[in-house]
Amino acid sequence: MNDSYFHEFGFGLAYKDGYFYATLATAINPGGASTQPQIQDRGKVIKVNKTNGELSFVASGLRTPNGIGIGCKGDLFVADNQGDWLPSSKIVHVREGAWFGSRSVDPEGTKDKKEDLPVVWLPQDEIGNSPSTPLAIDLGPYKGQMIHGEVTHGGIKRVFVEEVNGQLQGCVFRFIQGLEAGVNRIAWGPGGDLYVGGIGNPGNWGQAGKLHYGLQRLVYNNKSTFEMLAVRAKSNGMEIEFTEPLEEGDGWNTDHYEVKQWYYKPTIEYGGPKLNEKKLTIKSASVSDDRKKVFLEFDGLKDNHMVYIHLKKHFISDSGSSIWSTEAWYTMNQVPKGQNGVIKKAPFVYADNTLTDAEKKAGWQLLFDGKSMAGWRNFKKKTVGKGWVISENAIHLDAKPNKDGHWQAVDGGDIITDKSYENYEFTVNWKINNCGNSGIIFNVVEKDKYDYVWQTGPEMQVLDNTCHPDSKFVTHRAGDLYDMIECKYSTVKPAGEWNEARIKSLDGKVDFWLNGYKVVSFTMHDDQWKKMVAGSKFKDMPDFGLAKGGHISLQDHGDKVWFKNIKIKELKQNKQ
């Protein structure tokens, strides 16, 4: 509710131990500046005695505290929204006598007052814009954490909280999206389900493209999601905990992480920039024995700063799940003292075109050692054409225009593995030249009656999606099952950057992965497969997609392309 002053809302209620709690927003002029003067009761947390109705003030210094709720350990928390004296939105811990930094109600009286720091800052438009209703979550691996709604940024966010030197601080993650409206209220129902109230308004208050109203019920399905569960502060870096173990041998490469640090300074101006933003150099990455934690060692952590962690590699869990979100925002009110993270020596030194001991033990084989083309040859030939060379530690098609107008490169042509494979997992890193086209073709049959690998083998497309003509066609883009199934997500990197591709084929069930995302799944040889082939450009090729195994091919489509870290693991056929 609100009175005649713009934005002078009252928010709540939360109930705890015989008292109702609410928050009172300050009055705001059109445009966002605080009204002057303010009523002295504004920007406060109030509590009301359930029995006799007596009202008292608990905390002050808030701006637009849209939501108060019971969070972790049964304490009260408030979501406050960006504005003057508030450089970004935040979640605060309600304590008796706390003052949260807004000076608009009493500019002179609060001039020298020390602000109670937020549990988490919510960097504007990165992980928040209009936060609402903090609540505890007591389900699955998230027990002891908090969630809150978001009106404009949308969805529900999750907050891990820890106590450092008596001060609560923590990390915020993406959690839930895809709801029907911006989220203004969330509440747990008597059966343990989460009820979500949506809202919106024309202009800049509401999630773009969503309804301006809504009520939805979310039910926890007891299924695991692979994601960052927690990020913890250490004296010498940060520790990331995942909900599932990483793949064997993964997580040790410092190039797969990015860490930045900055701080905010409240002023009378609306919002505020990131100040002294710096990228921190990661000295080492250490993986725990259970592969569920990674400690990032780096110098330069400072009190009263934000620490941003980005997983540059889209990790895959040991069970084959793609990670849900790759970013975390930690509010470092205080750097812990005497709490160093565990630094371990990496079990291997990563190098292109090599296998780790763990990979060897798991059955992986190299198909390219970075030194020779052994194991590869042109389709229906015994050697590799001179157009294929070794460059940048990769098999490279140094494509030169064909003067006779042929679409393939001079002395190039498609190359194939010497050996045929049926049930396997295949991985490769590839990059393509500007506006280039290539492909990874599998189940290739080599017989005299076939002139090209694609007369029998399906293709995982390799493409520069930005400017190759094929990018205009759905199912012709990078990662697609060419001309049949488009990617679920667009995950390809720009031309000139390395992509990680994976093909898993087992008993006719095939998955394509691109840069850590499972982008395409299908089953070969069933009625649906036959229907897809009949509707594709391969419909007049009688043997297309019929083979249960075959050679793996790297395509010459007349454009420069590179392939490295080419590995395969043969899989056992499932018992029928």
Predicted feature locations:
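Acidic, Ser/Thr/Gly/Pro-rich low-complexity segments and short DxT(G/T)-type signature motifs
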Residues: 222-226, 247, 311-345
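Carbohydrate-interacting regions of secretory-pathway proteins
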Residues: 342-576
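Beta-propeller domains with acidic blade repeats across secreted/periplasmic ectodomains
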Residues: 1-234, 248
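Surface-exposed acidic, glycine/proline-enriched linker/cap segments
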Residues: 42, 103-127, 269-279, 478-487, ...
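A short glycine/threonine-centered beta-strand motif
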Residues: 237-250, 298, 311, 367-373
